[in-house]
Each structure stands twice: as C-alpha cells, then as structure tokens.
Amino acid sequence: FPYGLVRRHGTPPTSGIYILHEGALGVFDETLSEEDYDDIKDADGGVSKIDPEQPGGWIGFTDKYWLAAVLPDQDRNYSFAFKSLNGPTDRYQVDFIDTAGMVLAAGGSVTSKSRLFAGAKKVTLLDHYADEFGIPNFDLAIDFGWFYFLTKPFFYAINWLNGILGNF
C-alpha cells in the first residue's frame, strides 16, 4: 500500500487573523479542506479522515509563507487523514494511503510515484507544479480568500505591472 506523510512537531504560533489559514490543508474531490491545529486535536481520537470518491488530491501543512505537502500519483484512489499524535509535545501529521494497494507478482516489480513540495508559496511555482504533474487546485495552498475568482486575476495583473514598471 503506497503511502506518504508530513509531520509537524509542536504547535506553531499563528497570526490569529481570520483572513489567513495556517494549519493542515488538502484538496480532495477537487475541493479545498482546511483544518486548524485545534480542530485536529479535538477530532474523534485526534484523527480526521477523508475518503474522496475521485482519484488524486494532495495534503500538507501551510503557514503564512511556506507549504509542506505530499502529492501522490493522481491516477489512484487514496484515503487522506489529518492527525494529532500523543507525546510530550504536540505533533501533527497529514498522510495518505493507497486504498487499493498494489499487487506484486513473483519476479515482477511495481512502481508508485509521489512528490513532496516543501518551500515558499510562490504562485508561478505552484501553477507550474499543477500543470506539470496534474495536481488539482494546487494554487489553493495560497489563501486568496473568499473572492478567489477576483483576487487571483488581480494578483496576476499587479504582478504583470510590476514586471513592466518595477518597484519604485
């Protein structure tokens, strides 16, 4: 059963403002799901499980500028989970596991590809990954707010103007 995970040790200080999500997030059935650290702790047994109906998706942790996410093969079905782990410090984990598994015949081989993104949430980079690897809604790792359909085009317009006029 192919799987992948990202683990975070300690509850990071969050900015505490409502215009920005900091915590766990993922896209399942092409819909963004966001979980705050407190919500993960309060979940039944410290686990929130998502079993999407469509193949693909991704899961990870985000804060103001950074993202750490695991990106499974987009052609298979997975079960995703947000978890709070017991221990002397708060630990959080997001993971996926292939629900069908893979059959390995004697003398044969199987291949499973997953990717890890760990870095700055740069729009052009996230869009490139989404296009290159077929990752659904990877740009939603950036919190454009409720008016995404307006704010993302405004971002592109301002970015384009910056390329022409520069920063003065």
Where are these regions (language model features)?
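Interfacial loop/helix-cap signal at membrane boundaries in integral membrane proteins
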Residues: 117-168
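Soluble non-transmembrane domains of integral membrane proteins
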Residues: 1-138
